[in-house]
Regions:
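Membrane-helix boundary/helix-loop-helix interface segments in multi-pass membrane proteins
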Residues: 1-166, 325-339, 344, 348-354, ...
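Juxtamembrane membrane-interface segments at transmembrane alpha-helix termini
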Residues: 25-33, 89-98, 183-193, 203-213, ...
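Hydrophobic alpha-helical transmembrane segments
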Residues: 49-53, 273-294
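Hydrophobic, glycine- and aromatic-enriched re-entrant/interface helices and adjoining loop segments
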Residues: 99-109, 183, 191-283, 301-309
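Transmembrane alpha-helix boundary/anchor motif
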Residues: 123, 208-212, 289-293, 317-320, ...
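Hydrophobic alpha-helical segments of polytopic membrane proteins
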Residues: 145-208, 220-221
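Hydrophobic alpha-helical segments of membrane proteins
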Residues: 164, 168, 172, 248, ...
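Loop-to-helix entry and N-terminal half of a specific, functionally important transmembrane alpha helix
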Residues: 295-336, 342
Length: 411
């Protein structure tokens, strides 16, 4: 479909995404996610539906049409739209959600916060691109606080609503995305310095206030102190990866049922157990290729909004992948985040594919500008004024000569 529509964007993004999705589907089938009488038949349509949605978004946003998401002028209307969607998702979740294993889910165990990632990235991209010059002008060591005030007010409300749900992982993802978008968008080093200081201070305060985060840090530092309780999931995942060795125990030969939430949070441990270090390393290589392409597309984007939007999406996927794999391998504390493409979850899959559709549209670039007739007429006029100089020559340099241009040597 993209080829028929004249797509001129990145040729690697879609194949790598298809490989990751295929691996995820294969692992979910092996885990028996689609088995059982209680399983919703709609789950079988999630992957093909997500692929069609990706293609639809990419086709709709081609030739620079993705810029319609930023609105017109200052983008004030678009800012209100994305802000209301973001706050509305969290408000509905707080009002109707149900708590399960430390997270708050919507009806049918949907996760509206997955859609929140995209709406917040769109809000930040619109906000920064409309105020790019102002955000780049600092007064000494102070950022432009007056320009930042609306963004900070929205951000405080957003983080407060997420903390009411004890969703520390989402708070971390969104704050890192904001920092990277500000840093790369304005190219001012001050954002990185302030962001690092604020992240360290906020992390210390949050761990001191929320017992949920404290227990996860304790289970990370000393899982054997409570091997049948808080440390059970980490220890089972590590045991499975250790038993997988280099080549694994074979596909469908492992016993991941002993690991809690193996089909979601700990799906990477299942892959490492069955396919070994080689299989899990190949999976990480595919993720690395995908994320590298996302950041490359962001760097080559022809508009500030396209660059910021692609940067935000790439950062969200990068941080989420890092937090999931890092938590499973005990490199960092568990965050309860899923692994994109691989873990079970319809909301996550839909959001990832819509995001990739937008990045594909950004990679397609702007429509080619036709040559104006005015420029051709000017070139023709210049040629008539100087008959000995071709019209296609470089400005300020003669590309040809006429008989009177050379000086004759003295006889």
């Amino acid at each position: 479909l993209l080829a028929l529509a004249g797509f001129r964007g990145d040729p690697m993004l879609l194949p790598v995404s298809a490989l990751l999705s295929g691996i995820g589907l294969m692992v979910q089938v092996r885990m028996g996610v689609f088995d059982g009488p209680e399983r919703d038949p709609v789950d079988l349509l999630l992957l093909p539906g997500s692929v069609l949605l990706l293609l639809a978004v990419a086709l709709a946003g081609m030739r620079g049409r993705y810029r319609l998401l930023a609105g017109r002028g200052s983008g004030r209307a678009a800012l209100w739209v994305w802000a209301l969607i973001s706050v509305g998702l969290l408000a509905v979740l707080l009002a109707t959600g149900q708590r399960f294993r430390g997270a708050v889910y919507g009806l049918g165990f949907l996760t509206p916060t997955e859609l929140l990632k995209l709406s917040v990235v769109l809000y930040v991209a619109v906000y920064i691109q409309a105020r790019l010059k102002a955000l780049s002008r600092w007064k000494g060591l102070l950022p432009p606080l007056r320009v930042l005030a609306p963004l900070l007010a929205f951000w405080a409300l957003l983080c407060a609503m997420l903390l009411l749900q004890r969703d520390l992982g989402m708070v971390l993802i969104l704050n890192l995305a904001l920092l990277v978008m500000l840093g790369l968008g304005t190219r001012h080093p001050g954002w990185w310095a302030y962001g690092g200081l604020l992240a360290a201070g906020a992390g210390y305060l949050l761990l001191g206030v929320f017992s949920h985060g404290q227990r996860r840090v304790e289970a990370w530092l000393a899982p054997f102190q409570d091997p049948t309780g808080a440390g059970w999931q980490v220890l089972q995942g590590l045991s499975g990866m250790y038993s997988g060795g280099l080549w694994g125990e074979g596909f469908s030969e492992a016993r991941p049922r002993y690991t809690p939430i193996a089909e979601s949070d700990f799906i990477y441990a299942v892959i490492a157990e069955e396919l070994g270090f080689a299989g899990s390393a190949l999976l990480l290589l595919l993720f690395l290729i995908l994320l590298a392409r996302l950041f490359t597309i962001a760097a080559r984007a022809r508009t500030p909004f396209g660059m910021l939007l692609a940067t935000g999406i790439a950062t969200v996927l990068s941080v989420q992948t890092l937090l999931n794999v890092g938590g499973v391998t005990k490199a960092i504390p568990l965050t309860g985040l899923t692994l994109p493409f691989i873990s079970s979850g319809g909301s996550s899959l839909l959001t990832v594919f819509v995001s990739l559709g937008l990045v594909l549209a950004i990679s397609d670039g702007e429509p080619p500008r036709p040559k104006s007739s005015g420029s051709r007429s000017k070139a023709g006029a210049a040629a008539r004024r100087s008959p000995g100089v071709p019209a296609t020559g470089v400005k300020g340099r003669r590309t040809g000569s006429h008989p009177g241009s050379r000086r004759s040597k003295p006889g």
